[in-house]
Amino acid sequence: MAWPKLLFSSPGGEVMEHPTLLASVRSGDRLLHPTDGFLPLPRHARLVHLPGRLPVGIDPSSGRLRLLDEAQVGGKSFTPQAVGALLPPGYTRTLLPGEVKAGGPILPQWAYTAAGWGIRGPVTWALRTDRRRHWSPERFSTAELPRLISAHRHRFPENRVLAQLDICARAYRCFTSQNIFYLRDEGAIPASSSCNARCVGCISDQPAGGAPASHARLSEPPSAREMAEIGEFHLSNARGRAMISFGQGCEGEPLMRSRAIAEAIVAIRAKTSRGSININSNASLSGALKALLDSGLDAVRISLNSANPRLYEAYYQPRGYRWQDVEASIALARERRAYVALNLLLFPGVSDSAREVRALVQLVVRYRIDQVQTRSLCIDPLQYLEVARRAGANEKGNGIEQMLSRLRSAAPWLKIGNFAMATRERQTAPLYAPAFG
């Protein structure tokens, strides 16, 4: 098997293949020569340069790591930059780019994935973990989207939920926001401008000197009436997997607005029984969650980076709650027969360590979790590794695929994939197949 070559970029971002060095990868703190697991760069994936990061290759004659701190192309010398891949929906990262920091800034918040150059073109280290096609990028940001947005804004001219979704759909190309305008599948209902966590990798609120936030946070929380107006219209008319979800990347923690959301759910269900009502949450406030379940919430998707309390709290930096409160909310949702999914923020070399996998398996089995939605954590890799070290979570990783296989064997009922399950899909066979492909 011809091993993929190292990729690097010029200061201007032009990606090039090294003539001799092979690609290295990172798993946690370790730089490695991977033995397998790469696949052709998927359609809609893209290669990006990592500013301030030097690429690390492998000398094919000695097998040793080699730092590439200078490159020559066309008679000109320059300091090269490392290259990674950004994956489309339906794929899960298994390894990180092989790179070291050279005094650059914190990287923007993307899920950087190891990449190289194979015989037929670029390759990346990832798994295909969900083959359903309703989140395929070609279905979004189409030529008709502006017209659909205008029609919705004309129908609901004063609605602040729709005003926020307009921004998210156009500026950030948020698929869940766009679905509201396409009237299909899972649609976003942002609700909260405040949060009770200070996630290190928060995409809508970063401290001074941190990575630039990739989204502007919702500035003015909408009323129950505004949320109900958009939610009811979507559930009543959406094609496909009709669902609305409170809790989006552009906002804080929706449980902090449980009273308004509960009122909105009651109003929605007074007009339609169609579709599913979900919340994406940190599950910090079990009393607030109970109020939503009482009002008609039927699905809960709980975001976590770890089922290990120390690493969870090191990343989420909770204010006014602890890991035990998250478990209490999971137990409550399970008791109330809600559909319970984990939004699992994966990081190769940390999430797949023996200790982390053991804690996750115990959580899934203890509460008979319905689904694990794999998410590649969007963060500067070196920034998250520092969090993991402080939490004592820097053991050797054993591989993301092995982690998912361990979940499958311990919990054969568990659905593993990337996307939410519509009501009718929740009773079907698990998504996972041992050969991800």
Residue locations for each model-derived region?
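Catalytic cores of alpha/beta
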Residues: 287-294, 349-366, 428
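N-terminal [4Fe-4S]-dependent radical SAM core
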Residues: 105, 110-189, 206-210, 214, ...
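Active-site beta-loop-alpha junctions enriched in small/polar residues
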Residues: 249-251, 282-284, 305-307, 345-349, ...
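Auxiliary Fe-S-binding modules of radical SAM enzymes
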Residues: 1-156, 358-437
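Alpha-helix-loop-beta-strand connector modules within alpha/beta enzyme cores
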Residues: 258-274, 323-338, 392-417
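Core AdoMet radical
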Residues: 186, 190, 206-263, 269-288, ...
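Conserved strand-turn element in the central/C-terminal portion of the radical SAM core barrel
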Residues: 317-319, 329-356
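Short cysteine clusters
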Residues: 195, 199-202, 246
